[in-house]
Amino acid sequence: ALIDGDPVQISMHSNLIYSAFDPRFNVVSLPFLFESVEDADAKLDGEAGEKLKAILDEYGLHCMGIAENGFRQLTNSRQEVRSVDDMKNLKIRVAGSNLLMECYKRWGADATNMNWSETYTALQQKTVEGQENPLPAIDAASVQEVQPYCSMWNAIYDCLFFCINGDIYDSMTPEQQEVIDECGRLATQYEREINRAGDDEIMNRWQNENGVTITNYEDMDIDSFKQAVDGVDEWYQKELEGQGYDDAKELIETFTKEAVS
């Protein structure tokens, strides 16, 4: 509907949603791609983000800014996850992305995909033992009620594209476009601030009201997770090239440049 411009003219969706029709948007979800939220900001506001905006242009969408969904943190009902060994055969609901499924396979998990609307019941009944999502999404679905363990591993990041239908944008005067773009820039910056400000409150509430065990990044064997997915960038590049995306190597290299602290 956003592409057609009727009835939706402006929308905000994650890179995972857009990856359903163009797998190049999965590049944002490469494991341990971003060392920090500052690194994510620098890349998505810079050359890497411009490449994604150019891809959106191919579909008739003008991106006014890139906001944040956040790092996808891991929750489960079995045990505290500190290292890749703790992931073995853990039944985890994973978002519908071939890249994410490949990563969880390499981490040793028993990954499955299901609709998010069905996930709470599946977790409650222990049909699946865990899931991965940014904290606000987990909290909004009350998943903490049935998931006593949360690992803050910052493995995979989600962004949000704030887009307007390209034809509508092109019909505006240059002055109007300038206003739209500035509003988009300010809105996405503000959204990032709000999103990040809520994480500490969410974790404190989960611990105090739900008894959730929070395992912090610095208490985890992050290297064990990184080693398990070593080479997944090359796997992803071959996947893209196999589907005819000749810009795959350049796109990935733009995102995997040295981190900005």
Language-model-detected regions and their locations in the chain:
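N-terminal secretory/targeting leader peptides
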Residues: 1-39, 48, 56-261
